[in-house]
Amino acid sequence: MKKALLLLALAGALPLAAAPIPALERRGQAVQLIVDGQPYLALAGETANTASSSLEYMDTVWPKLVEMRLNTVLVAVAWDWVEPVEGKYDFTLVDGLLAGARQHHLHLMFLWFGSWKNGISSFVPGWVKADQARFPRTQIKGGKSVEILSTLSATNLQSDTRAYVAFMQHLREVDAAEHTVLMIQMQNEVGLLGDSRDRSAAAEAAFAGPVPPELTGYLQQHKDTLWPALRHRWQDAGAKAAGSWTEVFGPGPATDEIFMAWNYARYLGSMTAAGKAVYPLPVYTNSWIVQPEDKGPGDYPTGCPEPLTIDVWKAGAPAIDLNAPDIYLPNFNDWTGWYHRPNNPLFVPESRGDIVGAANAFYAIGQHAAIGYSPFGIDDTSRLVALRPGPDTGAAPPATLGNQPLPRAYALLAEMAPAILDAQARGTIAAAWLNKEMPAQDITLADYTVHVELRRNRRDPTQVPAVGYAIVIAAGPGEFYVAGLDVQVTFAPNTPGPEIAGLARVEAGRFTGGRWQPGRILSGDDILLDYDLAGAAAKNQSGSGLRFRGDGPAVQRVQLYRYR
């Protein structure tokens, strides 16, 4: 009997030994999400905040997500939903979400809506909301309390942590072998709204007190790589190793923001470490980024991991794996560059789901080795054809889902995922994101400058599409795979030798099982970009290049040769 029990126990342990839980690992030049031992590209979408509170509602959503070509879904789990009565946990909803995802062959990332969601404590249990004496709030100027739990309360932290650890323990029990859940988002867009910092008595005392040595030590150790605005603020105040917050960072709202960032980082970092002690899944935060109309911290959630304060978060919350931006603004390429840092791999957990979202996904994954992309509110299918970002998309839901811009982009990215992930690790991939304000981009890759521009009508070059995008992978000497939509692509050598790059062979095709399967051999009208060959030759161009139409993203393979 004992032998049988031992064998059963060993058998139960085998899946864990054979397939480690999901993790972030550096592979070559990229940090990648590893699932069941293999790099994984998260082609994701996030449901609306309360969608996951109803399994009946989610039953109508799962099939749509499959049709949209998602492989990963971001869903909320609220503290209020799992601990409606203090000390009594109910994970029925969690188990139902796991079952729904597994039935539809989808992975999950759970969003822990605990102390804060969009800065406000709206998803905490009622027993927390009703007991302000025990669970203190933040105060703003004038002594007014707001519905935002204080970061400085040990009781707030301990209570949220207990619930979160119970949740992670449950995940370990029900998913350690299945690996349905890939990552955890810790809270949601934290930070104080309505003031630049907490004005409670506890916060005023902390602000007047010394900056923790963990932060000043981090600044000293990483002074050469700090975000420039943070480094300049610290150095302009004397680069002090000790002092009050005003003495170390100078007076002003930016110092208030740094102070709040430290407090939020310590709170979320402590929770993350406690959860990882039970079940060490990767954990990220998401950020409400500064909007053009914002005049200062407090208009956006002060303390959120903004570009200014990511270093503060790295110092205060080392257990958190990455800080991710929610990007709805048009300058997507700027924001991805500001968040993708050597110590901060890129993931975009909220963004657009229309044609702009398709371009965003290609750019983040190709240019910044993003581990994934996720438009928000994906259960509202009108977001696939949105006329404008935001809760009111201005569009009706499409009749079919799979042929919309983002699902078609996801289908091609899924097909190319092995090649993309390999190229991310090798550093042989780049991307272009184009619109009428930025109609062309040059990419330096391998021994060539790759010129990507919006696809032009050969008879009327002024006719260009509104959006175009491309991923370029260097596969060997003079060999490239290019995937894109509504762009045209030319190549120019950037090493000594003949000045003009010609197209030796161009193939349309697809990837199957990670291998290239050639289809049509493209030539003639397929690749002619410019009838003015004399003008092209004067610019060291052949007049030919790759053309990608607007009826859906496609991939081509090109082999180049050089001549003069």
Region locations from a protein language model:
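Conserved, mostly hydrophobic/aromatic
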Residues: 37, 65, 73, 101, ...
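Short, acidic/polar
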Residues: 50-67, 298-316, 332-335, 358-361
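Catalytic-core region of carbohydrate-active enzymes that cleave or remodel glycosidic bonds
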Residues: 106, 268-281, 308-420
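Aromatic- and carboxylate-lined catalytic core of secreted/periplasmic carbohydrate-active enzymes
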Residues: 362-498, 507-510
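C-terminal beta-sandwich/jelly-roll accessory domains of carbohydrate-active enzymes
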Residues: 457-463, 480-564
